[in-house]
Amino acid sequence: MEKLARLKPAFDPISGRGTLTAGNSSPLTDGAAAIWVATGEGLSRLPNATPRVRLVDFEMAAIDIFNEGLLMAPVTAIPRLLAWHGLNFNDIALWEIHEAFSAQVACHIRALEDKKYVQEKAGVEHTFGSFPRDRMNPNGGSVALGHPFGATGARILSQAVKELAAMPQASRAIVSICADGGLSTVALLQN
């Protein structure tokens, strides 16, 4: 931790206010990922050991990064998706949140727990409870596992499918991905 604390900021090394370092940012890695999206009939042709879950719903959001913050679109999409399905944070067994930067996920959690912020940005008047940090990225997120540019969504989704398929029946997961600064796709999965 002491060595991480001594790393110089990558984007603002002069002012002393920069916070993004090689220690708290996801590495852009080489990689590829693929997922199958199929009907029940299509799944019947795959081996029984193949992890499988149901895509219940998804929500996309776009924000103005100059007024609402860089990489904050998931905070608009997540509350909308949960509210449409009458769910609270604790109804979700697994949260796979893309962490381009560690601080970005910390900002997401703080904003999601702020009722006023959720009302203003997502247009949702609902209290979701305390965010269950122990259910988020339990096997590591993008900072730990890498950020294969162009394949991050499939990497995170396939990780969520594998983890969710091993959980008790009817468990739910949220997969949240931010992109291009002001975009987000959030999916609700169930096994």
Language-model segments: which ranges?
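N-terminal extracellular/periplasmic Venus flytrap/periplasmic-binding protein-like
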Residues: 1-45, 113-118, 122-135
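Active-site pocket-shaping loop/turn-to-helix segments
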Residues: 17-33, 58-84, 97-99, 145-155, ...
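Short beta-strand-to-turn element immediately C-terminal to the catalytic PLP-Schiff-base lysine
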Residues: 36-40, 83, 188-191
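Phosphate-handling active-site elements
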Residues: 42-52, 88-89, 163-173
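Short, conserved aromatic-histidine micro-motifs
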Residues: 48-58, 62, 171-183
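Active-site pocket-lining segment
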Residues: 56, 64-144
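Internal helix-turn-beta structural module
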Residues: 84, 127-189
